[in-house]
Design a protein with these regions (language model features):
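Catalytic alpha/large subunits of respiratory electron-transfer oxidoreductases
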Residues: 1-207, 223, 241-249, 315, ...
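P-loop/Walker A phosphate-binding loop and immediately adjacent motor/lid segment at beta-alpha junctions
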Residues: 31, 211-232
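Long, contiguous, secondary-structure-rich segments that constitute the structural scaffold
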Residues: 222-281, 328-344, 348-411
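Structured loops at beta-to-helix junctions and adjacent beta-edge loops in soluble globular domains
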Residues: 82, 288, 299, 316-319, ...
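Glycine-rich, charged/polar anion/phosphate-binding loops
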Residues: 63-67, 141-143, 297-303, 329-330
Length: 411
């Protein structure tokens, strides 16, 4: 059942499903009483949101209620959160709202149940486990690039990142301001060409380590061959830098580092190749939650990107199999089958603007940035929404931009 009407309505949609479940008494009362806390506060918030939910969900009220009943009555149900067609305005709120939905229906701590956040890379879960996505101030690519562009950060050490492509506007502003740019990468990327120092890294077939996938399965990576030419594994590059800095090193092999991880992260302790963390746990929370009971946290996110006068479209990025092309563009075969650059536009909007399918248009932001791209009619975006493949130069960090679309004048 397709429910999402437009970007920014994810949390409202989930709250609408919870509202139906509570109103019709479909919640798992035993599970809520024994394994959660905060149900009273959640009910109060959902009741207070009634006008907002009704206004936003009026067009597909029946479908939302149907989906809520199906989800509740399912023996096993899982929520998958991906980048999808719509960009996430508040990813944390979406995750919390999804957890609320899973908890009130008892779809947590059981086989084939729960909430899974689908991340981009094969080892993204491993990066999360190591604390790479901390919420502390000073973390995050956009934050660091912003500080560098303001000349509040004078040195950048980039590993496997190419902000000139993934964040072209902010990336160039930042890289032109730093006094020292170090790039560690497999390729001589656009960003690497601007670097003061380039550290050549080898590929995954030449290094040892582990991958942790979404099901928390830790898999060992065995090198197929030695690093080519003067390249080194990321681990060996870090070791070389630590030695130059005369920093005390506790472990000089991947095995020693993995043992250290196990000492600091108890759920990694004793894990062998192919096992899931924590050891002996095919799914999480079967025996209970870390703090005893799971907390239901009310969230009330909504459409925060209003369309200013004269800019009637929401421009969002749609996921692309080839992403920025950092790896895929190195293959002639992949380049032949790669996605062509075009804007997806609802046919109703195209006809209103008198823009033909396959016609090139100009897309502009309020601050004067623009691009020209061919239009492709599609029923996927609703009227008022257009999509461009990731990465789009008008959008930074997978957000949403308000834009206007104009026919090109023929002189």
């Amino acid at each position: 059942i397709a429910l999402l009407d437009r970007p920014g309505m994810e949390v409202i949609l989930i709250n609408a499903m919870i509202q139906t479940i509570l109103k019709e008494g479909l919640e798992d009362k035993t599970f809520i009483e024994e394994r959660t806390e905060g149900i009273t506060e959640l009910k109060e918030e959902i009741t207070a949101l009634q006008p907002q939910i009704s206004g936003m969900m009026e067009s597909n009220k029946n479908e939302v209620e149907k989906a809520a009943r199906i989800f509740t009555q399912a023996k096993r149900a899982m929520i998958l959160i991906g980048s999808g067609l719509w960009s996430h305005l508040e990813p944390k709120d979406i995750a919390i709202a999804s957890s609320n939905l899973a908890l009130v229906t008892g779809h947590m701590g059981k086989e084939s149940c729960g909430v899974l956040i689908l991340l981009e890379k094969c080892n993204s879960q491993g990066a999360v486990d190591m604390g790479f996505f901390s919420e502390r101030e000073g973390n995050g690519r956009k934050y660091l690039l912003q500080k560098a562009s303001e000349e509040k950060l004078m040195a950048l050490y980039l590993i496997g990142e190419n902000p000139l492509v993934s964040s072209p506007v902010l990336g160039r502003q930042a890289l032109e301001k730093v006094s020292l740019l170090i790039v560690q990468d497999l390729f001589m990327t656009e960003t690497a060409k601007m670097a003061h120092v380039v550290l050549p890294a080898c590929s995954f077939v030449e290094k040892e380590g582990t991958y942790t996938n979404l099901e928390r399965r830790v898999q060992k990576l065995i090198p197929f061959r030695p690093p080519l030419h003067q390249s080194k594994s990321d681990f060996d590059i870090f070791l070389s830098l630590l030695r130059l800095l005369e920093y005390p090193i506790q472990g000089e092999t991947p095995e020693a580092v993995f043992e250290e991880i196990g000492r600091d992260l108890s759920h990694y302790r004793g894990i062998q190749d192919g096992e899931q963390w924590p050891k002996g746990s095919p799914y999480l929370y079967a025996e209970g939650f870390p703090n005893g009971k799971a907390k239901l946290i009310p969230v009330n996110g909504g459409l925060t990107h209003q369309k200013p006068e004269g800019y009637p479209f929401h421009l969002i990025q749609r996921p692309s199999l080839f992403q920025s092309g950092l790896l895929s563009s190195k293959s002639d075969t992949l380049k032949r089958v790669s996605e062509k650059l075009y804007l997806e536009m609802n046919p109703e909007d195209g006809k209103r603007l008198k823009v033909e399918d396959e016609e090139v248009v100009k897309v502009s932001t309020q601050d004067g940035r623009f691009l020209r791209m061919k239009v492709k009619y599609s029923s996927r975006p609703v009227s008022g929404v257009i999509t461009a493949p990731y990465p789009c130069s008008l959008i930074e960090e997978r957000d949403i931009e308000t834009v206007k679309v104009e026919k090109l004048k023929i002189i």
